[in-house]
């Protein structure tokens, strides 16, 4: 392969392509003369649209095909939405760069109502996420929550067609696609704790590819990486994928990491919450110890049910 060419494996959804172009532009700005090519591909998660993610099962629904391209040397890096990245990587691959985080909050989107609390009883709310579902159901048990799959444009069309009274999407995705005007309210973490890594873009590559790792170093955002490290450590201990009722959000405040997390029964009947504060260098250990606390406080039983009896040890 030519020394001045770098190939990016990406999904073909508008949001995935935005992320790939974002990384491409950053790389070319940092390394004049570098030629960056996109290698678009379709993942299993893109194809299975008629089934809720939690029922499809498996981890890495949106990344596996991209990882195969890396292993077969058809691409040099894969660009992912961090909330889709599994906790484990195929041998020889790893997450080497996390870019600066966009707003990680969930967005309340509706054509008729200004806020979640303004929805009348019996309103239909669309979301594809068990994490969002359990928090919505806890706060508003009088709402009807229905599955909503597809890319951002598809989901907005279903709302506009009247299938839903409101839908919940990620603020980051809407902003990146130039659809910020559709956001009626950004939900604070106290109402909807974000997904692990939500709003951050991660870059995966072959661990022995020194040249590519050196090119990517300039794109790593230290604060975002610290925060996502704490969130992912917790998720790893919980054996969480991208379709489980787990929320985790870390902030860096006055030089200290504040990590909040939850595990919820999908129907909102029970949500186990916890938090930790500590030094940035302890980010990983904080995540693990918070996960242990959640497991001991009832999360193990909730996850066993979601995972069909296969609970974290």
From Swiss-Prot:
EC primary class: transferase
One cellular component (GO) term of this entry: cytoplasm
Catalysed reactions, as listed in the record: 4 porphobilinogen + H2O = hydroxymethylbilane + 4 NH4(+)
GO molecular function, one term: hydroxymethylbilane synthase activity
Record family assignment: Belongs to the HMBS family.
Gene, per the UniProt record: hemC
Subunit structure comment from the entry: Monomer.
S-(dipyrrolylmethanemethyl)cysteine carried by residues: 242
Cofactor(s) in the UniProt record: dipyrromethane
Protein name per UniProt: Porphobilinogen deaminase
Keyword terms: Porphyrin biosynthesis, Transferase
Co-factor note (free text): Binds 1 dipyrromethane group covalently.
Function statement: Tetrapolymerization of the monopyrrole PBG into the hydroxymethylbilane pre-uroporphyrinogen in several discrete steps.
Other observations noted: The porphobilinogen subunits are added to the dipyrromethane group.
């Amino acid at each position: 392969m030519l020394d001045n060419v770098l190939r990016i494996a990406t999904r073909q959804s508008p949001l995935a392509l935005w992320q790939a172009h974002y990384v491409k532009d950053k790389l070319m700005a940092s390394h004049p003369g570098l030629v960056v090519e996109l290698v678009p591909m379709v993942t299993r998660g893109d194809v299975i649209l008629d089934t809720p993610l939690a029922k499809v099962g498996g981890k890495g629904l949106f990344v596996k095909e991209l990882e195969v391209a890396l292993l077969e040397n058809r691409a040099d890096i894969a660009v992912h939405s961090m909330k889709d990245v599994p906790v484990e990587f195929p041998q020889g691959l790893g997450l080497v760069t996390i870019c600066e985080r966009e707003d990680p909050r969930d967005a309340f989107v509706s054509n008729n109502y200004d806020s979640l609390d303004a929805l009348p009883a019996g309103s239909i709310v669309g979301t594809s996420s068990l994490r969002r579902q359990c928090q919505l159901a806890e706060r508003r048990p009088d709402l009807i929550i229905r599955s909503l799959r597809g890319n951002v444009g598809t989901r907005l069309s279903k709302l506009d067609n009247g299938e839903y009274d409101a839908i919940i999407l990620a603020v980051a995705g809407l902003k990146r696609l130039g659809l910020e005007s559709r956001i009626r309210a950004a939900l604070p973490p106290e109402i909807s704790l974000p997904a692990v890594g939500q709003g951050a873009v991660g870059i995966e590559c072959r661990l022995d590819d020194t040249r590519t790792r050196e090119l990517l170093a300039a794109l790593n955002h230290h604060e975002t990486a610290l925060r996502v490290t704490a969130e992912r450590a917790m998720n790893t201990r919980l054996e969480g994928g991208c379709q489980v009722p787990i929320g985790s959000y870390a902030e860096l405040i006055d030089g200290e990491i504040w990590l909040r997390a939850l595990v919820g029964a999908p129907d909102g009947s029970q949500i186990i919450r916890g938090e930790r504060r500590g030094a940035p260098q302890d980010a990983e250990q904080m995540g693990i110890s918070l996960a242990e606390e959640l497991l001991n406080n009832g999360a193990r039983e909730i996850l066993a049910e979601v995972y069909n009896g296969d609970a974290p040890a």
